A protein has these predicted regions:
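Amphipathic alpha-helical dimerization/coiled-coil segments
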Residues: 2-5, 10, 80-115
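Beta-hairpin "wing" of winged helix-turn-helix
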Residues: 59-69, 76-77
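N-terminal helix-turn-helix DNA-binding core of bacterial DNA-binding proteins
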Residues: 9-49, 73-82
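Short acidic/polar alpha-helix capping motifs at helix-coil junctions
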Residues: 1-4, 36-38, 51, 92
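Alpha-helical residues within the helix-turn-helix
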Residues: 41-42, 53, 59-60
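Juxtamembrane/interface motifs at transmembrane-helix termini
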Residues: 46-49, 61, 73, 95, ...
């Protein structure tokens, strides 16, 4: 796999964003599956606006993309980002989030949001 050289400012912004445990966990979850905000609420002890703010910051840097389906928005990692290869390298050293994903799937947030 060919390594991409990324502008130092963008690398600094990426590392700063991933320095927050919630954002790092969100990105790690999104590596394994797409999610809507209400699904992410199942694994974080925080408010919906807080999760949305974290996702906005990740989206602003181009790490996360969104797809609207009806009134719901699903988030996933942006594999076409110039930071994606670096992000993958970082996430290779982060524990996978299988337990949190099981928690999401077990909780059935569709009863709450309809997504």
């Amino acid at each position: 796999m060919e390594k991409t050289v990324v502008e130092l400012t963008k690398v600094s912004q990426l590392l700063k964003l991933l320095g927050d445990k919630t954002r790092l966990t969100i990105v790690s979850i999104l590596k394994q599956r797409e999610c809507c905000v209400c699904e992410l609420l199942e694994v974080f002890d925080t408010s919906q606006p807080s999760i949305s703010q974290h996702l906005r910051k990740l989206k602003d840097l181009g790490l996360v993309q969104e797809e609207r389906r009806g009134q719901w928005i699903y988030y996933s990692l942006n594999q076409s980002s110039d930071l994606y290869t670096l992000l993958e390298d970082i996430l290779a050293h982060v524990p996978d989030q299988t337990e949190k994903i099981k928690q999401i799937e077990k909780s059935n947030p569709t009863l709450r949001c309809g997504c």
